[in-house]
C-alpha cells in the first residue's frame, strides 16, 4: 500500500523504513532522531497478509493505543489493519462484511480497529529490542522513552520501503 499524506499531531510523525530497518521521528521539518529497529522475522518477504505470518505491515497508520504496562517496556499500538488491509481481506475472503465494516469505521473514527480478525493486529512500536518480532517494530528502551514523550494518540506512522 502506498503511503498517503497524513496530518500530524503537534507536528509529529514517524516513518519506518523496512529496507533500512530504521525508525525516523520528526517534528515539523526537524528530525528528532533516526534509530535502528527490529521488524517481523519474515518482513523481507513482502506485506502482512494475516495473523501469524510474522510480517510487519506496510502502509499508513496512526497511534491508537499507549500501553505503559507492556511486557515489552512501553508500547504504542498502531491502527493495523487499516481500510486498505480490510479491502484486501474482504476481497480475498479472509474477513467477512461485518469485520470489514468494523475495521473501516474504527479507522474513520481514529480509534483502535479490531485486532482479533484473521488479518491480525496488535502491531506495536515497543521497547526491549531483541531479535526479530512477530510483526511489531522493536526499538531499544531508551528510544522508546523518546517516542513515548513525543507520541500521543493519533500520531501518524508510515511504514514503507
Language-model features: locations:
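N-terminal short leaders/motifs
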Residues: 8-24, 77-84, 89-92
Amino acid at each position: 500500500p502506498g503511503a498517503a499524506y497524513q496530518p500530524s499531531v503537534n507536528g509529529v510523525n514517524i516513518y519506518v523504513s523496512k529496507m533500512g530497518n530504521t525508525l525516523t521521528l520528526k517534528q515539523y521539518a526537524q528530525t528528532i532522531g533516526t534509530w535502528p529497529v527490529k521488524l517481523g522475522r519474515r518482513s523481507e518477504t513482502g506485506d502482512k497478509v494475516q495473523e501469524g505470518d510474522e510480517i510487519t505491515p506496510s502502509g499508513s497508520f496512526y497511534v491508537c493505543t499507549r500501553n505503559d504496562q507492556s511486557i515489552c517496556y512501553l508500547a504504542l499500538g498502531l491502527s493495523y489493519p487499516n481500510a486498505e488491509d480490510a479491502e484486501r481481506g474482504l476481497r480475498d475472503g479472509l474477513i467477512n462484511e461485518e469485520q470489514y465494516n468494523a475495521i473501516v469505521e474504527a479507522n474513520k473514527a481514529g480509534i483502535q480497529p479490531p485486532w482479533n480478525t484473521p488479518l491480525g493486529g496488535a502491531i506495536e512500536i515497543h521497547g526491549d529490542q531483541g531479535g526479530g518480532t512477530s510483526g511489531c517494530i522493536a526499538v531499544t528502551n531508551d528510544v522508546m522513552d523518546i517516542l513515548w514523550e513525543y507520541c500521543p494518540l493519533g500520531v501518524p506512522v508510515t511504514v514503507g520501503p
